[in-house]
């Protein structure tokens, strides 16, 4: 006969299994979407990322790519090849975080774009790794510069930042 404690344990195991299943399914869907974007460029560095993101986006747009660009910061913007208008990045209630890249990739695929120029929004080195290896999987990476800034997160020396 099941005791209340046994039932609670089974319920917890089922919930964990469901969360794990949903996470694996979402990761597979995201990877499938990424594979539909042949050119993915990740812009990283301390200063000037938005400017370089816009420049590379404009070059690709001029070269007839169906390119979408995304800048970050306090005025994060989406740039689309088919219009001059820039659109604000619509954020979920939890605010800006690297997880929003899943939604960006979904938009890029929905628009049938063949290129994404994405400014890295992560400062923490661990998040930068997740941003690149799991969320964007860029086939071109651009490091704009390395400067002594964000040293509380990136490290005490320029070498650590690099």
Residues covered by each model-derived region:
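Short, basic phosphate-binding NTP loop
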Residues: 1-44, 51-55, 61-63
């Amino acid at each position: 006969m099941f005791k209340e404690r046994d039932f609670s344990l089974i319920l917890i195991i089922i919930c964990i299994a469901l969360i794990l299943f949903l996470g694996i399914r979402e990761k597979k869907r995201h990877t499938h979407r990424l594979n539909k974007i042949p050119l993915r460029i990740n812009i990283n560095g301390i200063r000037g990322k938005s400017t370089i993101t816009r420049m590379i986006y404009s070059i690709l747009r001029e070269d007839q790519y169906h390119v979408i660009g995304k800048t970050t910061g306090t005025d994060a913007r989406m740039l689309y090849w088919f219009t001059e208008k820039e659109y604000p990045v619509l954020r979920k209630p939890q605010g800006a975080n690297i997880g929003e890249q899943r939604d960006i990739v979904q938009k890029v695929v929905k628009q049938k774009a063949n290129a994404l120029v994405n400014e890295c929004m992560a400062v923490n080195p661990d998040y930068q790794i997740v941003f690149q290896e799991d969320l964007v999987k860029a086939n071109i990476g651009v490091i704009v510069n390395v400067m002594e800034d964000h040293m509380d997160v990136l490290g005490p020396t320029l070498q650590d930042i690099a």
